[in-house]
Amino acid sequence: MKEVRVVICGDQGVGKSSLISALIQEDNVTSIPKVFPIISIPSNPDSNDDVSLVLVDTQSDSNEREYLAAEIKKANVICLVYSDNYSYERVSIFWLPYFRSLGVNVPIVLCENKSEDLDNYQGLHTIEHEMIPLINEFKEIEACILCSALEKINVNELFYMCRACVIYPITPLWDAKERTMRKATIHALSRIFFLIDKNNDDLLSVDELNSLSEKCFSKNLSIEDASEILSKVKEICPEGVYEGQLTLPGFLAYNRVQVENGKQESTWGILRAFHYTDSLSLDDSYLSPKFEVAPGQIVELSPKGYRFLVDLFYQFDRDNDGALNNEELSALFRHTPGLPEIWVSSQFPNSTVLNEHGYVTYNGWLAQWSMITLFDYKTTLAYLAYLGFDTDGRGHNTDALKVMRKRVSQNRKVSKYDRNVFLCFVVGSKSCGKTALLSSFINNNTNRLTPNTVVNSVEFQSTQRYLVLSEIGETDLDILAEPKSLEACDILCLLYDSSNPNSFSFIANLLNLYPDLQKIPCVFAATKADLDRQQQRYPVQPDEFTKQLGLPSPTHISTAAIWNTSKEFFIQLAESAQYPASSIIRIPEEDSNKTNYQLVAALTAFGALLLSVGGSLTWKIIKHQYYSKK
């Protein structure tokens, strides 16, 4: 907004033009025009908003009614003036109904002019018995004031009030009828208190108050200023100060008094510094900032993003047990819309690493955010905003993310992907151990449910990466025919049960029925290595099969044995995703017509019957909330 347009209305003789003259002329003048031309007053150089004030004088004559109506419809705020009993009665009988008939929806400042002869008692009586009843009846009246153009009493305050009603509207903050702050105001200020309270002790120290002042008003708060604030709060709200620090009730009480006394500018300064709009919702551009992701790119958390999430974890781990329990998680997400929908759909917290009590560990916390950012970075951006990523001068919310290169299909020239998060599809026949592998990955040794998609960290070469394992059941195989799904997959884990002679044929047939799988790095694994190994009922045994594909022999793993080898296998998966060249299928051109791999489809026609179409809940999440956005 570049200007605030104030239309001054009222009956003839109430002093509309005199009020304008008193504002713009230093000396009292006897000759005042019947109506002033439109006057523009530039903003004060000391003002932070750079908004000029435009004053529109009007006449109440019936022959000027068309012009009056046109100007009222262009107004940002209406200054309605009366000066005696007759003009006061006309406020409710004519003027306010007239404004409503024009369909205008702007704030109104009610002014009694010519009040120089009123003493304090008479002034209070006027406000209580004349103005307050009108405010209660007509909600469009935002403020009222007693003025005198003759004595220049409250003239500057009148037009400041008109300006403030537009730039710093009181209606969204204050319920005039109930004389209390609105629930939305309390909710917004409570969230701001929560964001400023960095040590999570439910108190704002002098240092934290200073941080608030610097962020909102670009000025340091001296110890004297802080002491004055605390003293005022203690007077109006005894429980508002505790051990020299500000409590939430005190913070709310201080802002309530500011708004009640017409000093809502400071409260709006706080709200707008934290990206609140005039409707007290967070700005859409703050929740969903512009963030360009080109085709062939994916999004991960940046070091700044991880640092913020680490700080957040320790801030809310009140019992210092290295995990977030249900109460701590609830406190952390208290001032957001709740757990993100995609988190709920992914069956968090079971989707990540929990301790023996079922609480989210430090690694599990970071892993969950890593996975969700990979699938739906827009949700991550919104929740970084809700949780106050930018509060401590970390920069824009988009600084918490970084854009990385996707896997290039079947490109053996790419020796390494410098990424932190990889997606692995886990495929295999029924009961081959897919779910057991996922449970082992997130250290789920209890009876809790393991979702179809889980995430954990994997450390190799002194670097921590995050691996997302997504199980594809026999009813989910249609996803292997979707190009966007395959583009998202960084590594394909092909499992077979080494103790079941019919297990290997399933994944061998799969490579024929879905030839695009050949473009994805593959790792074969034989599960249940603690049981007797069986000869596979297939023309080519697994070791020879993988050799013909130019891949390493299957890794033998067991999730049940004491000598569990799955940890090393997860490292192998992550390494194969980061260094894909050695895991991409390679069939010599001259042998392409005679390899057993190419003959499999004719030898095992029954394999096609195993492949039905469907989709699990988890894959609905991935397909609809991730792939559709690519």
UniProtKB/Swiss-Prot annotation:
SMART domains per record: EFh (SM00054), RAB (SM00175), RAS (SM00173), RHO (SM00174)
Keyword terms, alphabetized: Calcium, GTP-binding, Hydrolase, Membrane, Metal-binding, Mitochondrion, Mitochondrion outer membrane, Nucleotide-binding, Repeat, Transmembrane, Transmembrane helix
GO cellular component entries: ERMES complex; mitochondrial outer membrane
Source domain of life: Eukaryota
EC annotation from Swiss-Prot or TrEMBL: 3.6.5.-
GO BP term (any one): mitochondrion-endoplasmic reticulum membrane tethering
Entry-linked Pfam families: EF_assoc_1, EF_assoc_2, Ras
Subcellular location: Mitochondrion outer membrane
Cystine connections: none
Binding site for Ca(2+) 2: 317, 319, 321, 328
Residues annotated to bind Ca(2+) 1: 197, 199, 201, 208
Transmembrane region(s): 599-619
Primary subcellular site in the record, as a coarse category: mitochondrion
Class of this enzyme: hydrolase
Binding site for GTP 1: 10-17, 57-61, 113-116
Function, as annotated: Mitochondrial GTPase involved in mitochondrial trafficking. Probably involved in control of anterograde transport of mitochondria and their subcellular distribution.
Identification of the protein by name: Mitochondrial Rho GTPase 1
Annotated source species: Schizosaccharomyces pombe (strain 972 / ATCC 24843)
